Structure formats: C-alpha cells, structure tokens
Amino acid sequence: MVHAEAFSRPLSRNEVVGLIFRLTIFGAVTYFTIKWMVDAIDPTRKQKVEAQKQAEKLMKQIGVKNVKLSEYEMSIAAHLVDPLNMHVTWSDIAGLDDVITDLKDTVILPIKKKHLFENSRLLQPPKGVLLYGPPGCGKTLIAKATAKEAGCRFINLQPSTLTDKWYGESQKLAAAVFSLAIKLQPSIIFIDEIDSFLRNRSSSDHEATAMMKAQFMSLWDGLDTDHSCQVIVMGATNRPQDLDSAIMRRMPTRFHINQPALKQREAILKLILKNENVDRHVDLLEVAQETDGFSGSDLKEMCRDAALLCVREYVNSTSEESHDEDEIRPVQQQDLHRAIEKMKKSKDAAFQSVLTHVCLD
C-alpha cells in the first residue's frame, strides 16, 4: 500500500528529469502519429509531394537561385513553364499581324525596355490582358509566344489548383500565385478558359469559392499599387460575356482573336503546309476561299486529313513488305477538297446537334 506522504514529498532531480523525458517522448510520438494519420487520409498527399519535386526541378531549369518558397508557392510553382522550353514564336502564328503588333507595343516593349518607361506611369505594361474570341483561333498560342518573346516566367494556372478541401487553404493558394509571380518577375499568370474560374458572381456561389475569388481580385489590385511590378495576368476565353464585371475592369487591355478572314486563312494554310509534301500546283487561295468559317484549328485538322488520304491510298495499294515513305505522293488539290467536305459535314453535324439541344431545352 502506498502511503499518502509518498505523494506529498517533493520529487528528486532524477525523477523530474525522467518525467520530462517521458513526457517529451510521449509528445513526439503523439505528434508524428497524428501527422502520419492526417497524411494517410489525405488523398492529395502523393500529388503534393510530386508537385513539390516538379517545382524544385523547374526552379533549377529557369535558373532561380536563393529564392525561398513556401509550401503553397511550391504547389503553384509546379505549373511553371520555362520560356526556353516554349517552342512557340511569332513565326508560328499566321494571320494575326495586327494583334501581334499591338502586343509587342503594349506588353513586350515595356518589359524588355523597362528603362525607357520607368519614369511614366501611363507607359507601364498592363496588369491584365484578355484574349477573347471563338475557339481554335490561337489565343493560347499567342499567350505562350508573348511570354517567350518577353522572356517572362509563365505560370499556366489551372483553376483546380486553387481548390482545396480544407477551409482557408484556397485563399492561401490564391495568395501564393501572386507572391510567387512577384518573386519570379517578370512573369505572366495565364488562365485559359478564364470564364470557368472568374465568371459572374451570384448568391448561389459556395462560400469558399466566393472568398477565394475575392482574395484573388484583391491581390490582383495590389499589382496596380506597385508600378515597378512586372506581373501580368493574361486570360483567354470564348465567352467574355460570362466574365464578372470586376474582372473585366482589371483587364483593360483586350484583344479580339476572331475567325480568320480570307487572306488570314491563306497565310495560315501556307504556314501549316510549309514543310509538308505538297504538289506545286495546289492553289491555296482557292482552298482559303472554300474554307469560310474555319478556325485555325479547323484548317490544321483539314490539312491533316488531306495528308492522311495520301498515306491511306499508299498503304492500300502496296504490300506490307514494300513500304517506302518516298513513294507516298504529295498532297494534291483534290485531297484538300475532300478534306474540306469532310470537315464541313462534321461542323454541320455539330451545329445541328447544338440546335436540337437548344430546342429540347
């Protein structure tokens, strides 16, 4: 039986040290056990680890040294694109000479020749640029070429990156987007299909989503207060009418990337077929006249179909043992005509499907 006086007597030095040691061990074991359990039940843990490794690799590639990044900035850095690895230049874009000229004057020149513009607030590069127009007309290509030519770090931001199941994490990720961009400036934050992320706000929006959007716009406004900051938010959309009016205000520089006109289609066709095996008698102006309403993406797919016709014809006319690439005939005018008809039927079928859906609604 333990006497009552045993509890009332003071502890010896060895007993105190032993108690502290046991409590320390217990606390450490408890901490790491809880941490392991939280990591085990987190379905995104593996993706976060991979994202951190990818971010560290990209930071080395772009030559960023002695820049300390937070956990959230590392998550965003995984979406960095090294300008040197962008194999897109202005020469890869045809039919948009006016847009390219304006972009060079308003965006690229103030970044590359900063010393010429530093004394004027009016001549600073815009903090927001919107590229809008029908799908398949080169909006994303223009954004990449702009970053390449300006030598900017390119953050290809996916809206899903900013969503997190834990309350408050989305706001921290939104803050990390801008803090990372500032550390890596000059930089471009590119948001493709920006209407899906920053569309018109309504009372039906989830609280976390509304707070994240508000945080994003608040940080975006902060770029305007620092006129020496070289961070640009560039968005692309084919539904500008769905964008929140507050977002439109923050993107004063807008470029309409419309479907190519006749001369633009001819220039695009020349670019697509420049290094292909094409018959010298092919009249690209005639092809351009027959492709009214085609986007740049449609023209590329049409040319691909025409080239495949030549390959299919060769494969069907020879045995497997005698295949020789040199014997494949060049693309002729008739191949392009057949590909155009196929593309028109495909577009008409898609249009009829949309009309049927609208009528049923």
From Swiss-Prot:
Mainly resides where?
A: mitochondrion
According to its UniProt record, which reaction does this protein catalyse?
[protein]-with a C-terminal TM segment(out) + ATP + H2O = [protein]-with a C-terminal TM segment(in) + ADP + phosphate + H(+)
Provide the leader sequence positions.
Answer: none
Q: Where are the transmembrane segments?
A: 16-32
Does the UniProt entry include the keyword Zinc-finger? no
Cited InterPro entries? AAA+_ATPase, AAA_lid_3, ATPase_AAA_core, ATPase_AAA_CS, Mito_OM_Translocase_MSP1, P-loop_NTPase
EC number of this enzyme: 7.4.2.-
Q: What class of enzyme is it?
A: translocase
Known CDD domains for this protein?
RecA-like_ATAD1
Topology relative to the membrane, per the entry?
A: Single-pass membrane protein
Top-level lineage group = Eukaryota
Any idea where this protein resides? Mitochondrion outer membrane; Peroxisome membrane; Postsynaptic cell membrane
Task: Please give one Pfam family short name.
Answer: AAA_lid_3
Q: Which residues lie on this side of the membrane: Mitochondrial intermembrane?
A: 1-15
This chain belongs to the protein called Outer mitochondrial transmembrane helix translocase
Organism of origin is Rattus norvegicus (Rat)
Q: Which lineage ranks, top first, belong to the organism behind this chain? A: Eukaryota, Metazoa, Chordata, Craniata, Vertebrata
